[in-house]
Amino acid sequence: MSVIKEYRTASEVVGPLMIVEQVNNVSYNELVEIQLHNGEIRRGQVLEIHEDKAMVQLFEGSSGINLEKSKIRFAGHALELAVSEDMVGRIFNGMGKPIDGGPDLIPEKYLDIDGQAINPVSRDYPDEFIQTGISSIDHLNTLVRGQKLPVFSGSGLPHNELAAQIARQATVLNSDENFAVVFAAMGITFEEAEFFMEELRKTGAIDRSVLFMNLANDPAIERIATPRIALTAAEYLAFEKDMHVLVIMTDMTNYCEALREVSAARREVPGRRGYPGYLYTNLSTLYERAGRLVGKKGSVTQIPILTMPEDDITHPIPDLTGYITEGQIILSHELYNQGYRPPINVLPSLSRLKDKGSGEGKTRGDHAPTMNQLFAAYAQGKKVEELAVVLGESALSDVDKLYVRFTKRFEEEYINQGFYKNRNIEDTLNLGWELLSILPRTELKRIKDDLLDKYLPLVEV
């Protein structure tokens, strides 16, 4: 039986960090309990060890800590999450404690929140379609099981509504396999938290969801643990309970701000924009926990959502996220201001695995050709619109005017489906054909004749 030593040698507190002296047999990432003079228990984690000193990161903040009267205990293990299949349908705080008024979980086991490194050889290739019910994603930027596909948003854009829509509607097509949503919120307001919980409750989606809520008034340092706790729950459900799990994490910008706060408190040499130089490595320890494993039925699919500071896609957070993940969904202020919901800008958006989750047997044989044709037609339509601004509409040819008509209807009917319309992939593909029929058949050069004969509507639009 291991003996837990108690220390009263805290020597310094700087922001979210505490220095404990005269320690021995302490390890990196070890869980720490700090008992305050009033009996309150706070938790932390060992960040660094030098000789007989340990630097502890405090999850609940350092306010009210009396160094002389505080008792520090090192648990002998890393921060762990109590997991059970009964987590599904429950709401937890950012540290994994129930906050929905329900009973405490009876844990099946305790898992290290940092997870286990996945051997690349044991990974299975993502190739199965996930239907979100959103045409701009399902058809043009297809999401597949095991993928990590981030949403790049901006200040004031409705990324929360988009996240809630995906959480409500996402499903595995033509399958009776278990599907679950793990939702991790970091630094959101009380109103936003209420919005998410109410949206999932009123549609019944809460029954297949696990929510972890770190609010804006919770300690910023807790945000470093929240996504790891959520991913630990997702891995448990996926690889031990054979469920297909979609993990939605919002807002990753708040997570990175918490990392910067800890880095500044440690007096580390800052990197780009003041973020720590290891930001890329740290983000990869989250994003790379998505995937499928050979011999396992379950999968973990990630949709991280981040707000780009000043709408700058070259900012370190979206920039590094783009390097690690497999594409991006970009929200547009221009589309939002025109009243389109969700305001997904499909031209710069990308899913690098979209060709792996589409086609006969997965969606439909005309998926990829119509996707390519819609992209080409919309891009041409936007060019023609710019030309009309410079030269006037009178300078446009008859075909150019059809492209303008196509673009207008594409934005109004295809992109602008609303946050509460759930379109299955059949309806999305059929709508795509209806819009393409606006253009002359001679312009549809990316679709083979046999598909044109089969699907192109015969009536004039």
Swiss-Prot record:
The keyword Ion transport applies. Pfam families: ATP-synt_ab, ATP-synt_ab_N, ATP-synt_VA_C. Coiled coil: none annotated. Gene3D superfamilies: 3.40.50.12240. PROSITE patterns: ATPASE_ALPHA_BETA (PS00152). InterPro entries: ATP-synt_VA_C, ATPase_a/bsu_AS, ATPase_F1/V1/A1_a/bsu_N, ATPase_F1/V1/A1_a/bsu_nucl-bd, P-loop_NTPase, V-ATPase_su_B/beta. One of its GO terms (molecular function) is ATP binding. Produces ATP from ADP in the presence of a proton gradient across the membrane. The V-type beta chain is a regulatory subunit. Belongs to the ATPase alpha/beta chains family. This is V-type ATP synthase beta chain. The lineage of its organism: Bacteria, Bacillati, Bacillota, Bacilli, Lactobacillales.
